[in-house]
């Protein structure tokens, strides 16, 4: 009966966790975990990365999400839920819930209704921290409150989390009868916002950055209790506590939280081909007609076309090329300027004949194999360039033709670079602008890390030592933390209480030096969840997985 930490936040819960997924999975494996859970705050940004890393390390991934939702019966009552996926349908339900949550339906009954209508696909845990059900226990209303929650989510398996501390204080003994009377399952529980106990203070610094608050370091801040515990030691604790019931309940609760994400499947919408033809037939006809119109009918073109179409069909991308052709056709019909094409797609004769690109690959000796290759299965990557003010028109056309469910845009994550993290950490400790500039100006411009700076810049190393060592360690720990998301030219800031000029792309204070101002304007570092972010005037065509 191995222990599993049921609530874990990663850096994808923007500025709420110091846990990076690569470190989480590696540490979890070292600590003896057979299962690892990811339950970020309302988002599933890290789900695919987490899933892949777990599978590669022989660990069962448990996918969940943390939501604060209102009750259907009383919207003034809110409860923190961790919702877990059971199978593929459960994962799809989590995606839908995450969408509702991010659309601002955090505290409405719509989420409650959606969860209730998918009772076979999900499970729920009520964490004990700051919860109404734990508060109700002290008022003698535990059974009534849990019974009401059970009624809200009728048909769903619901558990309450019982921590090691609750067992050791004897708290669970006093509430066990009420929990079981309400028909709710008590399970062994812990929560992690950081990996190691010594990461507690850097995590507090991260929260201060998010909330725009200041801190001072005390020795009590050296370690914390919400780290990732060792699986073996927690198993022993809960095996001996209350007849091992919490651990056995945990095992039963998690055994069917199994999800398989079809990572390598091609999920393209079908292009509406006219006249009852197949996509391959229609694609061939378009290319053949274009060859005649363009006067490129010599054997070298004919043979190249046959070869490319064979590869495209064999790899299942006939519809992909028709979709992109149709988008470009629509743009030209509406008088929207299009680019001539760039990157490896310029090596495709099919793309040239469909006017997706404007470069003849045979004339310029460009290789199709660099774009698509039987020996290396990858999706085609075609970048389409449109004017900034026409992007929404193009997107609206795509949505109208294929539906919202088949169209997606790519999120990017602004991260804390070396200069910005030093600024933010100094502000957290109430340093004046001169001190902030002194630290910041000793860091080279560009994508340089704090570790590099410590090694290469003795002046900075001297400034960062001594009484500033805790700032140094905190800065290193929160460096590269994801700070905000953006899509196209819009940004969604992660701050709950947004401090003035906190974001790395915002304007700096008026008394900053000119060089510091230039650096700050340049510093936003972007990382992507799956593919490169398009330029502002570029639309990248990818399948919506």
Residue ranges and their predicted role:
Residues 1-467, 471-473, 535-545:
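Alpha-helical scaffold/interaction cores of sigma-54-like transcription cofactors
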Residues 446, 454, 462, 466-544:
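Mature, Sec-exported extracytoplasmic domains of Gram-positive
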């Amino acid at each position: 009966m191995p222990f599993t930490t049921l609530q874990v936040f990663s850096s994808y819960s923007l500025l709420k966790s110091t846990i990076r997924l690569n470190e989480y999975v590696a540490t979890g494996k070292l600590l003896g975990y057979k299962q690892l859970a990811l339950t970020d705050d309302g988002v599933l940004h890290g789900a695919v990365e987490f899933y892949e890393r777990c599978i590669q390390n022989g660990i069962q991934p448990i996918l969940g999400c943390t939501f604060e939702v209102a009750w259907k019966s009383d919207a003034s009552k809110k409860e923190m839920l961790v919702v877990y996926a059971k199978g593929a349908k459960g994962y799809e339900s989590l995606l839908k819930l995450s969408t509702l949550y991010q659309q601002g339906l955090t505290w409405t009954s719509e989420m409650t209704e959606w969860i209730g209508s998918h009772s076979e696909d999900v499970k729920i845990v009520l964490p004990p921290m700051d919860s109404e059900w734990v508060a109700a226990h002290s008022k003698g209303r535990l059974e009534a409150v849990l019974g009401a929650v059970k009624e809200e989510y009728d048909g769903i398996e619901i558990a309450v989390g019982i921590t090691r501390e609750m067992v050791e204080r004897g708290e669970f003994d006093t509430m066990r009868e009420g929990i079981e009377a309400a028909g709710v399952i008590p399970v062994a529980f812990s929560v992690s916002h950081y990996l190691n106990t010594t990461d507690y203070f850097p995590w507090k610094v991260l929260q201060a950055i998010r909330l725009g608050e200041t801190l001072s370091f005390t020795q009590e801040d050296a370690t914390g209790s919400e780290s990732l515990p060792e699986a073996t030691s927690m198993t022993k604790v809960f095996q001996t506590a209350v007849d091992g019931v919490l651990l056995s309940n945990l095992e039963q609760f998690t055994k069917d939280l199994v999800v398989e994400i079809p990572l390598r499947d091609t999920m393209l919408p079908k292009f509406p081909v006219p006249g009852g033809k197949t996509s391959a037939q229609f694609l061939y006809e378009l290319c053949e007609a274009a060859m005649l119109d363009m006067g490129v009918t010599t054997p070298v073109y004919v043979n190249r076309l046959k070869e490319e179409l064979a590869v495209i069909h064999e790899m299942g991308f006939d519809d992909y090329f028709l979709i992109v052709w149709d988008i470009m056709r629509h743009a030209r019909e509406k008088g929207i300027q299009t680019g001539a094409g760039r990157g490896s797609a310029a090596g495709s004769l099919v793309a040239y004949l469909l006017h997706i690109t404007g470069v003849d690959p045979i004339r310029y000796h460009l290789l199709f194999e660099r774009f698509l290759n039987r020996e290396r299965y990858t999706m085609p990557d075609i970048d389409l360039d449109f004017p900034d003010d026409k992007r929404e028109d193009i997107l609206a056309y795509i949505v109208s033709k294929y539906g919202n469910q088949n169209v997606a845009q790519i999120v990017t994550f602004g991260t804390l670079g070396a200069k910005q993290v030093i600024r933010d950490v100094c502000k957290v400790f109430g340093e004046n602008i001169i001190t902030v500039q002194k630290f910041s100006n000793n860091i080279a411009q560009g994508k340089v890390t704090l570790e590099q700076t410590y090694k290469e810049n003795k002046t900075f190393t001297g400034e960062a030592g001594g009484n500033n060592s805790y700032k140094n360690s905190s800065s290193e720990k929160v460096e590269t933390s994801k700070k905000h998301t953006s899509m196209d030219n819009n940004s969604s800031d992660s701050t709950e209480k947004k401090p003035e000029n906190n974001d790395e792309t915002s304007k700096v204070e008026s008394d900053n030096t000119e060089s510091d101002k230039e650096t700050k304007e340049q510093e936003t570092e972007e990382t992507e969840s799956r593919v490169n972010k398009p330029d502002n005037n570029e639309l990248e065509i990818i399948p919506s997985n």
